[in-house]
Amino acid sequence: MLELTQTPQGVILLVKAQPGARKNEVAGERSGRLLVKCTQAPEKGKANDAIVEILAKALDVRKSRISLISGQTNSEKKFLIEDATIEEINKQLGIDS
């Protein structure tokens, strides 16, 4: 089950990043984290920027509403999706709440 945390600012989403993949995609859940694959290499924040774009598209939100709050140099990351609810995130990802 995907771990999501509601905060006054929005929803904290745990992500397992897989940089250097063949294509950009949200590839399901792994150990409570959303698995996000991106083609960018993990250098100079390129993969983080790509993951923000992938999440924005998957969640149908503006990139400016997504902030990386921890894991800048780690494959396990935390993102804040501003002004969102857990129900909205689950709906956009096709997860039954």
What spans do the regions from the language model cover?
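Contiguous, often N-terminal, cationic amphipathic patches that form binding interfaces
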Residues: 1-45, 49-52, 61-63, 67-72, ...
